């Protein structure tokens, strides 16, 4: 029972459910608030373009080979992520370098080697034992190697679009050749004597190209394209389940043929429908039609003879059945009687079996009773003899007591 001192307090809602209210928001709504934007000048605001970042780091991967970020207790530093100024391809990508990428990689490595040699040469002190390859000689060799790379003048050979065209060297050379041919067409022909004097300054800038045509390669590529086309057609037929109609005369002989053979067969069949050959086809069809009519007549005659023979056999069978149908009721009656006789014999056999079983049970019980009777008679004889002995002993005692 409630305490009576709280009965008449103001603000109490009677006959209503209890409600407990707090000034705080629920836990799910407490984290939902608008973060105040920082407007301080000390904070640097960096605008990040996700598309540009994606384009920059697309097809890149982080090399996790030989990395160790664990704590160290020795003075040697652990190996973490390494970053460089320029990298063509990462290790383990399995992608072959293009000529442009290989050229830029070699040029960059030569520049790094030059910087390292210059740094070593500036910081090297005189030592008692000099190495066979001094920094000065190494710097000369690096400069010669760089000059050799620059002498390849790939950009001069392939034009200003080498960075783009070197991904496809054959296409770049073909475009360059077409450009020089157009330039040669528009250039005026020199005089006849100038060609005999020797190569002029203009001829030094020309590049000689040799074009080699391989018919076998063209045939092989064409056959490969046809095989690829047949493969795609087979996959398409398997996808749509295009089954050939064996009854269609246009598809006869096309099973298992390649595409070219199929086209040739269809072309030969189309050529047969020429106007010049339609008369011959019509004459052949008329002769075939006459032969078909003769065959139909002979077939009808043969079918009529077969029908007559079958009807004659059926009539003979009916005649035989008439003589057998007279005796059929008697046979049925005899079978019914025989069925009843078999049922009675089966019942009699069951009764005999039951009687034999009962007789065996009675004989067994008689044997048991005979044995029990013999045992009872034997026990009675023994008991009778014992009683007689007891009576004789009692008579003797009585006689002794009477004396």
Swiss-Prot record:
<dbReference type="GO" id="GO:0005869">
    <property type="term" value="C:dynactin complex"/>
</dbReference>
<comment type="subunit">
    <text>Subunit of dynactin, a multiprotein complex part of a tripartite complex with dynein and a adapter, such as BICDL1, BICD2 or HOOK3. The dynactin complex is built around ACTR1A/ACTB filament and consists of an actin-related filament composed of a shoulder domain, a pointed end and a barbed end. Its length is defined by its flexible shoulder domain. The soulder is composed of 2 DCTN1 subunits, 4 DCTN2 and 2 DCTN3.</text>
</comment>
<dbReference type="GO" id="GO:0031982">
    <property type="term" value="C:vesicle"/>
</dbReference>
<dbReference type="GO" id="GO:0005737">
    <property type="term" value="C:cytoplasm"/>
</dbReference>
<dbReference type="Pfam" id="PF04912">
    <property type="entry name" value="Dynamitin"/>
</dbReference>
<dbReference type="GO" id="GO:0005813">
    <property type="term" value="C:centrosome"/>
</dbReference>
<protein>
    <recommendedName>
        <fullName>Dynactin subunit 2-B</fullName>
    </recommendedName>
</protein>
<feature type="region of interest" description="Disordered">
    <location>
        <begin position="183"/>
        <end position="206"/>
    </location>
</feature>
<dbReference type="GO" id="GO:0030286">
    <property type="term" value="C:dynein complex"/>
</dbReference>
<keyword id="KW-0472">Membrane</keyword>
<feature type="region of interest" description="Disordered">
    <location>
        <begin position="1"/>
        <end position="26"/>
    </location>
</feature>
<keyword id="KW-0493">Microtubule</keyword>
<feature type="coiled-coil region">
    <location>
        <begin position="99"/>
        <end position="132"/>
    </location>
</feature>
<comment type="function">
    <text>Part of the dynactin complex that activates the molecular motor dynein for ultra-processive transport along microtubules. In the dynactin soulder domain, binds the ACTR1A filament and acts as a molecular ruler to determine the length. Modulates cytoplasmic dynein binding to an organelle, and plays a role in prometaphase chromosome alignment and spindle organization during mitosis. Involved in anchoring microtubules to centrosomes.</text>
</comment>
<keyword id="KW-0175">Coiled coil</keyword>
<dbReference type="GO" id="GO:0005874">
    <property type="term" value="C:microtubule"/>
</dbReference>
<dbReference type="GO" id="GO:0016020">
    <property type="term" value="C:membrane"/>
</dbReference>
<comment type="similarity">
    <text>Belongs to the dynactin subunit 2 family.</text>
</comment>
<feature type="coiled-coil region">
    <location>
        <begin position="381"/>
        <end position="401"/>
    </location>
</feature>
<keyword id="KW-0243">Dynein</keyword>
<feature type="compositionally biased region" description="Basic and acidic residues">
    <location>
        <begin position="184"/>
        <end position="194"/>
    </location>
</feature>
<keyword id="KW-0963">Cytoplasm</keyword>
<dbReference type="GO" id="GO:0007052">
    <property type="term" value="P:mitotic spindle organization"/>
</dbReference>
<dbReference type="InterPro" id="IPR028133">
    <property type="entry name" value="Dynamitin"/>
</dbReference>
<keyword id="KW-0206">Cytoskeleton</keyword>
